[in-house]
Design a protein with these regions (language model features):
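Short, glycine-/small- and polar/acidic-enriched structural segments
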Residues: 1-30
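Alpha-helical secondary-structure segments
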Residues: 36-41, 143-144
Length: 199
C-alpha cells in the first residue's frame, strides 16, 4: 500500500522474534483439522492487523478454507482470546506472542489451548526511502544503519511500547518479501493494494 501511494523504496527491515500467527482451540473443542473448522466461529483481533487478522486469514486459505464463507470470523479486539476461554467461539486466530502471553496470564499450558495450525514467519517491519533520494545516499544510510544497528535497536527497545523488538536485527529487504501480505489481503477479499484495511 505504501508503495502504491508513494512509490517509496524499501531499503531495510527490522525483524521481530516469533512474529507469526497461529490458529488455536480449546482442548475440549474436539476440533483437530481444517475440515472441522467449517461452520465454526473463530475470533481474531482487529481488522487489518498483520498478525491478528491477515496472518490467520492466510493460514485458513492455506488450509483450504475461505475465511469469508467457510466459517464465521468475529473481530473482537483485545477480547478475542477471552472469547475462546469462555467458549463464546470455537477457535481463535492471532499472534503467537499474544498466545504465549495469554497462556502465562491464565497459568495455562499449550495442551489446554492446542495450536491447530502455525503460519509462516510474517515479514519484518519495513523502512522505506523516498523515490526522490539519490540511490547512493540510500546506500550510505543503509550501510551506516547496519554498522550501528546494536545502538539503534537498543534505542528502539528503550521504549516500553517497542518491547516486541527485543532480539531484533536490521536486515536487507526487497518488495517481493511482502508478497505474502498481498496474498493475505486477497484472503480477506481485497485485491487492490491501494488502501490500508481497518483503522
Amino acid at each position: 500500500v505504501i508503495n502504491a501511494k508513494t512509490e517509496a523504496v524499501p531499503f531495510l527491515a527490522i525483524t521481530r522474534p516469533n512474529y507469526f500467527s497461529v490458529i488455536a482451540v480449546r482442548a475440549d473443542s474436539g476440533l483437530t483439522n481444517a475440515e472441522q473448522l467449517k461452520g465454526q466461529t473463530l475470533s481474531m483481533s482487529d481488522i487489518g492487523s498483520t498478525s491478528g487478522h491477515l496472518g490467520p486469514s492466510k493460514i485458513l486459505v492455506d488450509q483450504g478454507l475461505d475465511p469469508q464463507t467457510d466459517l464465521e470470523v468475529l473481530m473482537l479486539g483485545d477480547a478475542e482470546l477471552q472469547a475462546l476461554k469462555n467458549g463464546d467461539v470455537n477457535a481463535w486466530g492471532g499472534s503467537y506472542i499474544d498466545y504465549e502471553r495469554f497462556l502465562e496470564a491464565e497459568g495455562a499450558q499449550e495442551s489446554d489451548y492446542p495450536i491447530l495450525f502455525e503460519g509462516e514467519m510474517l515479514p519484518s517491519d519495513v523502512l522505506m526511502a523516498s523515490k526522490n533520494l539519490d540511490p547512493a545516499l540510500v546506500t550510505e544510510i543503509t550501510e551506516k544503519m547496519l554498522a550501528n544497528q546494536d545502538a539503534l535497536i537498543a534505542a528502539i527497545t528503550s521504549v516500553d511500547a517497542n518491547q516486541k523488538f527485543v532480539g531484533s536485527e536490521l536486515v536487507a529487504v526487497q518488495d517481493s518479501d511482502y508478497d505474502s501480505i498481498r496474498e493475505s489481503y486477497q484472503a480477506i477479499g481485497v485485491n487492490e493494494f491501494t488502501e490500508f484495511v481497518g483503522d
